[in-house]
Amino acid sequence: MDHKSFLKTLNAKDKARLNARSDVRGLCHLMLYCAALGVTGSWIHFALPMWQIMLIPHGILIAFLFTLQHECTHNTPFRSLWLNSVAGHLIAFLLFQPFLWFRYFHLAHHKYTNIPGKDPELDGHEKPSSWGAFVRHLSTIDYWWAKITILIGNSVGPLTASYIPPRKRRSLRAEAVLLIVAYVVVFATAPTALLWLWIVPLILGFPVLRLYLLAEHGRCPEVEDMFLNTRTTLTTRIVQFLAWNMPYHAEHHAMPSVPFHKLPTLHKMTALHLGQVSDGYSKFSKAYVSSFWD
């Protein structure tokens, strides 16, 4: 059964139950997440024993805020639209990723998932197919270059990408300009501690996010069926928490309107129909790089 056939089996009551959003669930998850950031950040700030090692988990926590911003593009983490917007824009600053721009980019990705020439995630961003490309992918060099060019391009460029509605160009330009001004002010006035609490950890943590994201569509068929072009990865509760349940990624692509806390329920309903399932990220990674030896 493909994802469209599955959706036809759901009645109105099923859909309403799955699509029910909650400010309480979203805020509770966010508070726990911020508490974890507070612990790792305090450890670094007060230079507690082995604080240098703590830079890595702190950076992973910052980098994985990407998954919350990703959810905010769908307005699903919280019931209140303004909470999704505020969270999305705050994370935009931390990750150098404009929220409004990312929303249109990501919605196009959902519309044309894994279809070459249509999915913007595939435009100039081929999945690594050799050790050299894999190392470069994890180094995040391409990520940082892309974010710099997006910020500058959105602020002064023509904004001609097909996924950007013409009527939104002014908003995207204003967003990019405001972010650039904010970065100039912050980096000109912020204490050195900010470097160790934000930039250095983010650089160290981003490779983990890149490896995680590779599992979502890497080596999946270039077809329209979300149960085949997207991978669900069975993993630990810690990773599920860190990624806001996005390892249930095929389920998310089949029903993007389902909030993170309902994805485990949706997984139980779709498990028998999923065509791409990996038993953990380590197994996925080993299987992925094994082809490099051929």
Predicted regions and their residues:
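Membrane-water interface at transmembrane helix exits
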Residues: 41-45, 69-74, 78, 107-110, ...
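Juxtamembrane helix-capping/reentrant segments at transmembrane boundaries
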Residues: 19, 77-96, 117-133, 224-239
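Transmembrane alpha-helical segments that form the membrane-embedded catalytic/substrate-channel core
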Residues: 59-72, 98-101, 147, 198-224, ...
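Active-site-proximal inter-transmembrane loops
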Residues: 158-163, 226-248
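Non-catalytic, topology-defining segments of multipass membrane proteins
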Residues: 1-61, 68, 94-198, 261-294
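Solvent-exposed interhelical
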Residues: 255-257
